[in-house]
Amino acid sequence: MSFTLQDIAWHRSVGQLVEALDAPDFWIRLVRLLEQYVPFDSWVALLFSQGRPQVFAECPGADGGPDPLFQDYLRGLYLLDPFYIASRENPCSGLFRLADVAPECFEQTDYYQRYFRLNVVADEIQINVQLSGERTLCLSLGSRRRFTPEQLAVLGLVRPWVAGLMRQRLAFEDEVLNSPAAPEPGWQGSLEKVAEQMGTPLTARELEVGRLMLSGCSSKEI
């Protein structure tokens, strides 16, 4: 069996990450390693579950502080995020591209106009680890350019190592995991309130159609 220098470098780096599982800068070390193989412009490690996403680590904004657009995402725009919707409707582990989850009319959605085109810009991929209790651990990588097939192939190749490290890291994220997730903002309540003002209560199916429309689904997809 022969190994290339790149193989040796990868395995050495993964070994160093195993040693750093309990380190405060674990997530930064992980994304810096991935950047050596695939370029990207933004990243965040978070947990999708009931309630608002819980953030473990994120890349800083342009001024080095918290990204205000990402704070808007956490306050409610995440409900329209195709990755979030997919994690709630069809939770599973794997490597997912934007093209795998985005609706037909994605570029016409509020989410795209108010967040994605400004903060992520062109493309996004997620490495997801499905957990118990309807929770999904996610490492999201955003790019101002489309990820190439070669880059996606590299990420697919290293995903098992990355996913294993992510799962093991959870044992050291007690501070975030033990803090109660904030409840979801009431998009459903907002729709119901509008319907009440019109004097026409909405059925469960009408509420679901409203959510799908806000998420950018076409009439065919609905």
Task: Name each region found by the language model.
Residues 185-222:
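Helix-turn-helix DNA-binding segment
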Residues 154-175, 219:
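Signal-transmission/dimerization alpha-helices at domain junctions
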Residues 13-17, 154, 179-190, 205:
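Hydrophobic helical signal-relay modules used by sensory signaling proteins
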Residues 96-98, 174-175, 222:
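Short, hydrophobic secondary-structure boundary micro-motifs
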Residues 166-186, 193:
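Short alpha-helical interdomain "coupling" segment at the junction between an upstream regulatory sensor module
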